[in-house]
Amino acid sequence: MRSLFTRFFQLEAASGLLLIAAAVLALIINNSPLSYLYSGLLDVPVAVQIGALNIAKPLLLWINDGLMALFFLLIGLEVKREVVDGHLSKPSQVILPATAAVGGMVVPALIYWFINRDNPAAVAGWAIPTATDIAFALGVLALLGKRVPVSLKLFLMTLAIIDDLGAIIVIALFYSGTLSSVSLLLAAACLVVLIAMNRLGVVKLGPYMVIGLILWVCVLKSGVHATLAGVALALCIPLRTRNAETSPLLALEHALHPWVAYAILPLFAFANAGVSLAGMTVESFTHPVPMGIAVGLLLGKTVGVFGLTWLAVKLRLAALPAGAGWGQILGVAILCGIGFTMSLFVGSLAFSPGSSEYAGMDRMGILTGSFFAAVIGYAVTAMASRKPRVG
């Protein structure tokens, strides 16, 4: 299990650095004479037709609805593995990161709502600052190397996974469109088939992938966000088999992880982080939408994660990660304010590009809040991790 975690952490760290590069590249291109190529590429229509079935979307939505379904498939696999046979399998190991994750979602949402409470249209973005980008946050923490204890990295990873689970629930409950009963029934039928395959001991991944693709199409047409099909599929992939040497879930997780870390997430960041800075003023950054997001990420995450961690420890519900101090917990709490890809994704649901006046503003708030959370979080964690000099 430790070697699995080490591989996961190293992969997430490298992915975080690649995400930064992708976002910076998008910002540079979209604020240069080549900006027309950037917007033109994302608006390229892509259509798939099989008989009477026709799915036509611009490239941006194929990335957000299609490729990100694979990202959520990976999240679902990680959550199932952790719950069945990992750090979420024992209640004593879950209490502290789960409590911190709840605080890290509730406080930013309340801050955003308070700042935008007089604008019903803007309030729709309340969930944007509740997200944490696990790849980016772990990537920043990785820069400190062995100065931070492994237990602190495990705490951040577990917290972020629970945070992702919360984001999945939020998307399902609050960001679904008009529902189609026929498509939902077909999606339910696909789920029944997947569950039956699991119970009957089917271990080949091929059949799961075929039914999963059909499930994705049904969910896409149902009005529920298509990425949730990835989560549903993940929960049906068997972790254990009669032959203890094989695990379909681990095999799929290992196969997906490099693609998600090095291709899908950087591509998503490139497609969604290209904010045009033309005509921006100080007032643009102090608008309630970007202000609510940035303050929610930077201040809300810090107060929520650190505050509820402190409360859980003081009430003796849980203990601090072994070898970690309060200064390091504060640093990690600030790092949780790196919303980036997850916040961009929720923002694309709350304020659809091209159909909402806040579509660009939310990205300004996300990038600003995430940047300062990364810089300040790194500095605080580094200072708290200094070893006293001898002599």
UniProtKB/Swiss-Prot annotation:
Q: Which GO terms describe its cellular component?
A: plasma membrane
Q: Does the keyword Cell membrane apply?
A: yes
Per the record, the GO terms for biological process are: regulation of pH
Catalyzed reaction equations: Na(+)(in) + 2 H(+)(out) = Na(+)(out) + 2 H(+)(in)
TM helices/strands, residue ranges: 9-29, 36-56, 59-79, 95-115, 123-143, 154-174, 177-197, 213-235, 259-279, 293-313, 329-349, 364-384
Where is this gene product found? Answer: Cell inner membrane
A GO molecular function annotation here is: sodium:proton antiporter activity
Keywords for the protein's UniProt record, in alphabetical order? Antiport, Cell inner membrane, Cell membrane, Ion transport, Membrane, Sodium, Sodium transport, Transmembrane, Transmembrane helix, Transport
Main location class: membrane
One Pfam family in the UniProt entry: Na_H_antiport_1
Source superkingdom:
Bacteria
Which membrane topology describes this protein? Multi-pass membrane protein
The cross-references to InterPro entries, in alphabetical order and at most eight, read:
Na/H_antiporter_dom_sf (IPR023171), NhaA (IPR004670)
Assigned protein family: Belongs to the NhaA Na(+)/H(+) (TC 2.A.33) antiporter family.
What is this protein's function per UniProt? Na(+)/H(+) antiporter that extrudes sodium in exchange for external protons.
Output this protein's name. Na(+)/H(+) antiporter NhaA
Q: Which organism is it from?
A: Pseudomonas putida (strain GB-1)
Q: Report the gene name.
A: nhaA
